[in-house]
Amino acid sequence: LRTLTNASRRGGLDIKLPLTIYNTSCYRGIPGRYIAAGPLASRWLQQVFATDATLVQSGAVILGEPAAGYVSHEGYAALARAPYRYQEMLGVIWRENPCRWLKPDESPVLMATLMECDENNQPLAGAYIDRSGLDAETWLTQLFRVVVVPLYHLLCRYGVALIAHGQNITLAMKEGVPQRVLLKDFQGDMRLVKEEFPEMDSLPQEVRDVTSRLSADYLIHDLQTGHFVTVLRFISPLMVRLGVPERRFYQLLAAVLSDYMKKHPQMSERFALFSLFRPQIIRVVLNPVKLTWPDLDGGSRMLPNYLEDLQNPLWLVTQEYES
């Protein structure tokens, strides 16, 4: 909605701008809190992705944010509880366009588009599968490998969680096959584990100072809710039409994760800390909070609420498979 791309110069920097529209949990402004730290965070992540063997092998890419700017409103900044949206109306983030990282035979596809259907109610994912020449299960397995494995590895080894909803994930596609993932948005959509991980030592202090830190049992929901619930949950019903039942969908995901973990036995303690196979997962909700959060008068963004836990589909299909 608010990212502008250079139409005349392919590969030029995108610019992200504030937009006074209430979408999901907040008005989409540019907070000044992360402006100075954003470029430092993206440079650190790019270094990690360029030197970590697993991430290099995955081909995953961090879309850098080389610069950002923000101007505060003197009047609203002086008020203790001024609505936050009035303090986030003048800012900009420059971000690398995915085309900068694509190979000549690749094309960029937002993962959110995999939830879409055409006018005949045919899933777009099905068109990519047909073009790939792969069967649906093989195609899904490849999708999980290039998207979920890098996200989970970043979390377990470095204690860094990215809220990887469908707009933050770009797939590099080649003849309908997902090749690798391009990740973006580190100003507010990146969080750190509360525990001290030595792999995080090189993260600039300026980034640490403005980045939220959560215990492992809450940080894991950035992957479970941020990706499994908000993205995969909407793709899986479409895959049923293509011959992949929902349980089989999650069996394939579980198999990809299990294969990754078997290849990294030295990280077993981290896998236990960030377990994706517990019987239940946190249920994070936004819509009910919208009805009660004093957004018009408050100076802060809405916080999610937690309801009764949900059964974990990865645990369910693993139990069925083992039995």
Roles of regions detected by a PLM:
Residues 159-172:
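A short glycine-rich, hydrophobically flanked beta-strand micro-motif that places a catalytic Asp/Glu
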Residues 153-158:
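Protein kinase catalytic-loop region centered on the HRD/HxD motif
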Residues 148-152:
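Short C-lobe core helix of eukaryotic-like protein kinase catalytic domains
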Residues 1-146, 173-323:
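Nucleotide/phosphate-binding site architecture used for ATP/NTP-dependent chemistry
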